[in-house]
Amino acid sequence: SRYRGRLKLPKETGDELLRVIVGRLNNSVSHEEASDALRTLATGLSPQAVSSTTFSALENLSRTIGCFSASLHFTERTHLAIEGEKSQVRLVLSAIHRRDLEQAIDHFRHYWTWDDDWFDIAHYIWIWSGGISGVKAFDIEPQWDALLRDKTVTILGPAETSLTKRSLKNESLVVRVIMQDVLAWDAHSDPLGGQCDLAYASRETRNWLRETNAWDQLEQFQVTSLRVDEGSELGSETASLRRAHDPRKLMLGGSSPNMIPLMAWDIMRVPGVTLTMGGTTFFASQEAYTAGNRRFKHTSGRATDETGSTGELFERCPTFARHNVLENLTLLANWVSEGAISADKPMTRVVALSPEAYMAELDTLYGIERR
């Protein structure tokens, strides 16, 4: 009843939602039955009567129990509800996440102001449109700018990649995510020969570094960028650290961006960067983490597998919901489709998928098996 009140759902709808969630958790309701029930619930809710934020919450709840394809029915109604609401910012974000560049440009032209809420949107559209629309809003940090301006940069994620050492141009910088037990890569087996010039660390990794005082392990990187909130201490006065820019304002459902789009966004805030990305399939692959990229999760004291899981029931699905995997994919798919950034073959395959095809893959890989 508490969640019914927060979501402002009719009692019958709330009861059915609870039945589906609990049933999926204890496996008394199959993935197919749960998906069908969620689709029926979505169809019965009017975008004129339910807020876009409620539809976003239902979208995320569906993904928490691994019903990714079914969640798209709530996604669709989120966008329909936004059309009837008064938020001009959310109208532009809706166009971005529907991959509609023309509509995004049109809304931006009519509505944008110099308010802080618009600057990230303005810069994103400027990159996406190749400078035709939007407003470039580089946030210059002198030392960071000196490292990256007019440079060729390769972001390599933890998944499989078609990139090799031959893919790297002279003086190309390689950027990776570091994690506990993943702070170096074997020069012989790694596709890029173990190169990593700039590192990024999530909040969880930063907490591990701080709790174990392992800052000296960052000396091999020119700079380590941390995902920390504004005003938070970085954690060390001796390591070369900086705070990464978070594209949270580009997310529609109030979700938290994944590290890969965060890295791309942060780097593309520097003028003149030529960015190539690889090793990221947005979890739409059998091996989201290759052998050299599987972390030890210090919060649980267990190692992770090729999915990033320690083996707990429904461990990955809630993470995908919290980060909103589809919105993360869309932010970079838009740029790849317009040639703003380049991608390796596995990433190119995934960003070309329709939302329906992408979610169907996540259903197969994670939802049906309750991973």
Regions found by a protein language model. Name each.
Residues 1-371:
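Metal-ion/cofactor- or nucleotide/acyl-coenzyme-handling active-site neighborhoods
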